């Protein structure tokens, strides 16, 4: 097949499915070139405004000209300039200067490329967190409602993926929520820990600005403070090389990778529960699970989350390696890698949160299936209760234990060797030895008596930890997610 012209046919060029297929428009824009280069121009404006306020010869007319052209970006011209200059920042300096001829002389005054590059990255990372946090809060809120609704519904617990003591559907969901609440706290901390790079010059010494202000250190410090405030940050990093420390990127991607681990665990549980036919993710009326097997109801949303969460978890390796090989004040081998991993981490996190919200808004529970599985396993779990009841009725503990051992082994053989149902209780009812407690067997086998404090734990956890954590996001809780499958 001949290679078609990509300019004539956009489908002839590879597009990342993170953007073309999955991510929200808001997160896609956050990492777009329009957002990036528009932010560069705003940073040049902030710098000029601050320099003017501190006495440099910059006119109101120059400032107004810059303000009027913040989004008037000739991307074609910028691309041509970059092709010629082999320098993206200078290409955009020239492009901005072209539409601001009066301000051309003072654009980028005293700055280095990382003034716009790194500071823009920090703004984009901050804004990315601000997009993710409400989404994560909505997922937690939906799951909290689900947990509250099913706080008392007994279900078979599993350890080692083998039947264990009973829990409740709501309590199991709270395990998911607890992990996500930790992620919420970690994302908030990572966002709030972000500082502005500020105006630091080529190697972080602020030498160019000290020269501009004729050795006035206080004005250089004030310039840094003013620009930092204009960009919406409370603090800037006190010391930098040419770039801000790449350990910051490690922190950012670490919390996102941790979120990926949480989502992967939750969606794996949902996939296993779907196999057990106890809980299913939403399944549309006309949705097709398999082209060959019409009966299939595949948990494809949860599978998508797991697939993308694995990608998200691996991305943290990039900033770890990048930070470790930055020589002295900086090397450029960070640049291409960061263009990929930072954007992909936030886009991927955005996708899995949107998908998980959609799942959590439509989880379907099948209580009768859950109850049937409990009834298959509960008789064996109830043996201790039966022994205690017999002793209270005057029986001998050792004799009772032996009787139950024999009957339970017989029942287990029916289940494992014959494929039948667990008939242990029927055997107990048929044995005259247990006649003193026959009328109490139903109460001894009530599943709710085996769930301990699970319902109370759910109520306390939701009230004291979950709901308070969601208070800052109350105004952003509306809206359901409709996925493009």
From Swiss-Prot:
SMART domains: ADSL_C. Its EC number is 4.3.2.2. Induction: Significantly increased expression by estrogen. Rapidly up-regulated within 0.5 hour after extrogen exposure with a peak at 1-4 hours and diminishing thereafter. One of its GO terms (cellular component) is protein-containing complex. Pathway: Purine metabolism; AMP biosynthesis via de novo pathway; AMP from IMP: step 2/2; Purine metabolism; IMP biosynthesis via de novo pathway; 5-amino-1-(5-phospho-D-ribosyl)imidazole-4-carboxamide from 5-amino-1-(5-phospho-D-ribosyl)imidazole-4-carboxylate: step 2/2. Belongs to the lyase 1 family. Adenylosuccinate lyase subfamily. This is Adenylosuccinate lyase. It comes from Gallus gallus.
């Amino acid at each position: 097949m001949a290679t078609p012209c990509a300019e004539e046919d956009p489908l002839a060029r590879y597009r990342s499915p993170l953007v073309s297929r999955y991510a929200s428009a808001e997160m896609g824009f956050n990492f777009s070139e329009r957002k990036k280069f528009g932010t560069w121009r705003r940073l040049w404006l902030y710098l000029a405004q601050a320099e003017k306020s501190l006495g440099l010869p910059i006119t109101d007319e120059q400032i107004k000209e810059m303000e009027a052209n913040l989004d008037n970006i000739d991307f074609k011209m910028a691309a041509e300039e970059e092709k010629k200059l082999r320098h993206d920042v200078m290409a955009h300096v020239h492009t901005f200067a072209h539409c601001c001829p009066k301000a051309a002389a003072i654009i980028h005054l005293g700055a280095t490329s990382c003034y716009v590059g790194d500071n823009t990255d920090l703004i984009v990372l901050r804004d990315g967190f601000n997009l993710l946090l409400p989404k994560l809060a909505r997922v937690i809120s939906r799951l909290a409602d689900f947990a509250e609704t099913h706080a008392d519904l007994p279900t078979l617990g599993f350890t080692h993926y083998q039947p264990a003591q009973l829990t409740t559907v709501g309590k199991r969901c709270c395990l998911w929520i607890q992990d996500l609440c930790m992620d919420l706290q970690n994302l908030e901390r990572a966002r709030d820990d972000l500082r502005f790079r500020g105006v630091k010059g080529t190697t972080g010494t602020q030498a160019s600005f000290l020269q501009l202000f004729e050795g006035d250190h206080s004005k250089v410090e004030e310039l840094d403070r003013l620009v930092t405030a204009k960009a919406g940050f409370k603090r800037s990093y006190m010391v930098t090389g040419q770039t801000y420390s790449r350990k910051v990127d490690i922190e950012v991607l670490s919390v996102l990778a941790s979120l990926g681990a949480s989502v992967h665990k939750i969606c794996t549980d949902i996939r296993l529960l779907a196999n057990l036919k106890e809980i299913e993710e939403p399944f549309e009326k006309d949705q097709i699970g398999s082209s060959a097997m019409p009966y299939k109801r595949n948990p494809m949303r949860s599978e998508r989350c797991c697939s993308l969460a694995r990608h998200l978890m691996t991305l943290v390796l990039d900033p770890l390696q990048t930070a470790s090989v930055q020589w002295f004040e900086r090397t450029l081998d960070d640049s291409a890698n960061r263009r990929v991993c930072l954007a992909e981490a936030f886009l991927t996190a955005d996708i899995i949160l949107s998908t998980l919200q959609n799942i959590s808004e439509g989880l379907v529970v099948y209580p009768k299936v859950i109850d049937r599985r409990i009834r298959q396993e509960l008789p064996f779990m109830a043996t201790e209760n039966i022994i205690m009841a017999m002793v209270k009725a005057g029986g001998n503990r050792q004799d009772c234990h032996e009787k139950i051992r024999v009957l339970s082994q017989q029942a287990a053989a029916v289940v494992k060797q014959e494929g039948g149902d667990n008939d242990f209780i029927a055997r107990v009812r048929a044995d005259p030895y247990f006649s003193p407690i026959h009328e109490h067997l139903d109460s001894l086998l009530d599943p709710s008596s085996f769930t301990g404090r699970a319902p109370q734990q759910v109520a306390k956890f939701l009230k004291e930890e979950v709901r308070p954590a969601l208070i800052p996001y109350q105004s952003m809780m509306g809206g359901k997610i409709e996925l493009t499958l």
